[in-house]
């Protein structure tokens, strides 16, 4: 029987209502439990959380102790990757959805990248992938800079964690770490690339529509979200 795949926004918490990372993690876990229990339904449901976090560093499973910034709040998380920063001006998205009985995690990451690349094109930015490195990148002269990071986990065939798109955030916090463990490339923001301010709220609609399309889900909030 045909399966209807609907991706609905569960929560939007943008400036000035920044979402504490711990609260966002609890929301993810609640949605994960709900979606895990409904995987057998013919109508496959999925949920999306969009937010700007309060300033925080998060360390993925492969982060070593010496990679942690000194005298800063760091939260250990179960996603892939290493250490990164979240905070105001950065659009964070958590798609919580089933990947089916035989999850293809790499394909899922590539779909997220595709959605973000298409969203960047809507504001005139040419983002791209780099082989062997997750996320979305842009070219700055002779060097590559990351504009979006991706770190996911799949548990009981259902996804957790997601992506972080640098929109108008301060880049200074990244100077205290080696972002995602990549020492030979920098980070940037949409606003820095375009030389004008683009906030998470301004690009949210495009990101949601593009992610839905890339994941082949029906967007229940077509138009402005």
From Swiss-Prot:
UniProt-listed Pfam families: LplA-B_cat
Entry binding sites for substrate: 79-86, 149-151, 162-164
Pathway: Protein modification; protein lipoylation via endogenous pathway; protein N(6)-(lipoyl)lysine from octanoyl-[acyl-carrier-protein]: step 1/2
Site (Lowers pKa of active site Cys): 146
Record domain BPL/LPL catalytic: where: 42-219
Active site: 180 (acyl-thioester intermediate)
Main location: cytoplasm
Sorted UniProt keywords: Acyltransferase, Cytoplasm, Transferase
Gene3D superfamilies xref list: Bira Bifunctional Protein, Domain 2
Coiled-coil portions: none
GO biological process entries: protein modification process
MF-aspect GO terms: lipoyl(octanoyl) transferase activity
Domain of life from the UniProt record: Bacteria
Keyword Cytoplasm in annotation: yes
Keyword Cytoplasm: yes
Compartmental location: Cytoplasm
Annotated EC: 2.3.1.181
Reactions performed catalytically: octanoyl-[ACP] + L-lysyl-[protein] = N(6)-octanoyl-L-lysyl-[protein] + holo-[ACP] + H(+)
Gene Ontology cellular component annotations, sorted alphabetically: cytoplasm
Other facts noted in the record for this chain: In the reaction, the free carboxyl group of octanoic acid is attached via an amide linkage to the epsilon-amino group of a specific lysine residue of lipoyl domains of lipoate-dependent enzymes.
PANTHER family: LIPOYLTRANSFERASE 2, MITOCHONDRIAL-RELATED (PTHR10993:SF7), OCTANOYLTRANSFERASE (PTHR10993)
Function: Catalyzes the transfer of endogenously produced octanoic acid from octanoyl-acyl-carrier-protein onto the lipoyl domains of lipoate-dependent enzymes. Lipoyl-ACP can also act as a substrate although octanoyl-ACP is likely to be the physiological substrate.
Family from the record: Belongs to the LipB family.
Protein name: Octanoyltransferase
Organism of derivation: Tropheryma whipplei (strain TW08/27) (Whipple's bacillus)
């Amino acid at each position: 029987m045909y399966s209807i795949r609907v991706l609905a926004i569960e929560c939007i918490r943008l400036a000035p209502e920044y979402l504490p990372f711990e609260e966002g993690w609890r929301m993810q876990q609640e949605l994960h439990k709900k979606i895990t229990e409904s995987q057998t339904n013919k109508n496959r449901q999925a949920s999306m959380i969009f937010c700007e976090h309060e300033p925080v560093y998060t360390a993925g499973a492969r982060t070593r102790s010496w990679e942690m910034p000194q005298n800063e709040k760091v939260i250990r998380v179960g996603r892939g990757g290493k250490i990164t920063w979240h905070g105001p001006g950065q659009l964070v998205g958590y798609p919580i959805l089933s990947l089916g009985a035989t999850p293809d995690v790499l394909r899922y990451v590539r779909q997220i990248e595709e959605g973000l690349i298409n969203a960047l094109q809507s504001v005139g930015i040419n983002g791209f992938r780099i082989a062997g490195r997750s996320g979305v990148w842009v070219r700055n002269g002779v060097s590559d800079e990351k504009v979006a990071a991706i770190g996911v986990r799949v548990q009981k065939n259902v996804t957790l964690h997601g992506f972080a798109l640098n929109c108008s955030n301060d880049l200074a916090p990244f100077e205290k770490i080696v972002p995602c463990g990549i020492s030979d490339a920098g980070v940037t923001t949409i606003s820095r690339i375009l030389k004008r301010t683009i906030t998470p709220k301004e690009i949210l609609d495009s990101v949601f529509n593009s992610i839905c399309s890339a994941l082949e889900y029906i967007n229940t909030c077509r138009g402005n979200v």
